[in-house]
């Protein structure tokens, strides 16, 4: 259910009340919402909320669970408000972003892994990269797939070999990270793309592997597609890339092979399905 109201009181570390139909009604926030929104909930704040219709007992209080906030603001002066959060403004910004970026690079990395018997001071490095470059309509401009030799720990571990289903073929195709960096940087220089990834880990890992190899930061224009989904749909839990693909396509993916090019192609599909869904 949805409700627009003024906060009547803030109680404890996760409750607030409003006056609804002449009576005091309690609402509670789960931990993820407390961290994000509780600091804005003061007496007199204007809230638009989505909540559970049936109250439950929490800390001896019957309260409705907040599913998500739609808007939070506070009055300022006579006719103005300070807006702390507005889901529709966020959604408009996301629509503007996904409709305007061009060209678009979808990228995924696979990393070397700590072995079954721990290697002292081991650091993960990128050992495989899948890249798909498209225009704003999804037409493919370029596809690349690199296997990369790790530098600091030059052997791909048995655990990584098994997890990634590597054979001697993949090992024979591997190039140095510096060679990969040179080729990748040239593509970035030529096209200056927005780089779409699913989650923060790929961004972090590219920067880390560049540092290991003393390569300058490419200062890419990263867009976290997972974060766009979380913000647009106001999700409590982060969805997986493959589960979103299955949701959008209403079909089942074959068993995941941990192949960076396949994952980059799935990321492309999810981006354009997301774009199609939110821009109508």
Regions found by a protein language model. Name each.
Residues 1-102:
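N-terminal accessory regions of nucleic-acid-interacting proteins
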Residues 24-26, 139-143, 217:
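Short, mixed charged/polar active-site loops
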Residues 100-105, 109-203:
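Conserved non-catalytic scaffold segment of RNase H-like nuclease domains
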Residues 107, 223, 262:
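Active-site flanking residues adjacent to catalytic metal/cofactor-binding acidic residues
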Residues 110-113, 227, 266:
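Short, glycine/acidic-enriched loop or turn micro-motifs at the edges of active sites
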Residues 148, 154-164, 171, 228-264:
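Active-site-proximal helix-loop-helix substrate-binding element of RNase H-like nuclease domains
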Residues 191-200, 204-211, 240-280:
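Acidic, Mg2+-coordinating catalytic module of metal-dependent nucleases/exonucleases
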Residues 218-229:
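Conserved beta-strand -> loop -> alpha-helix junction used to position metal-binding or nucleic-acid-contacting
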């Amino acid at each position: 259910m949805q409700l627009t109201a003024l906060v009547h009181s803030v109680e404890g570390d996760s409750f607030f009340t409003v006056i609804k139909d002449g009576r005091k009604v309690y609402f509670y926030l789960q931990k993820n919402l407390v961290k994000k929104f509780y600091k804005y909930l003061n007496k007199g704040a204007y809230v638009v909320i989505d909540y559970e219709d049936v109250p439950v007992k929490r800390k001896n209080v019957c309260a409705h669970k907040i599913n998500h906030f739609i808007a939070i603001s506070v009055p300022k002066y006579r006719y103005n408000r300070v807006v702390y959060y507005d889901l529709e403004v966020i959604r408009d910004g996301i629509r503007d972003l996904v409709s305007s970026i061009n060209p678009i690079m979808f990228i995924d990395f696979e990393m070397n892994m700590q072995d079954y018997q721990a290697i002292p001071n081991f650091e993960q490095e990128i050992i495989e990269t899948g890249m798909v470059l498209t225009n704003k309509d999804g037409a493919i401009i370029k596809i690349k797939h690199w296997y990369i030799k790790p530098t600091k720990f030059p052997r791909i571990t048995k655990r990584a070999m098994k997890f990634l289903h590597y054979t001697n073929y993949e090992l024979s195709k591997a190039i140095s990270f510096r060679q990969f960096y040179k080729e990748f940087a040239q593509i970035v220089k030529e096209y200056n793309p927005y780089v779409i990834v699913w989650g923060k880990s790929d961004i972090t890992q590219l920067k880390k592997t560049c540092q290991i190899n003393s390569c300058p930061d490419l200062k890419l224009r990263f867009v976290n597609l997972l974060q766009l989904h979380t913000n647009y749909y106001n999700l409590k839990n982060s969805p997986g890339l493959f589960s979103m693909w299955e949701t959008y396509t209403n079909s089942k993916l074959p068993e995941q092979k941990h192949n960076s090019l396949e994952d980059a192609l799935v990321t492309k599909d999810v981006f354009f399905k997301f774009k199609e869904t939110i821009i109508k």
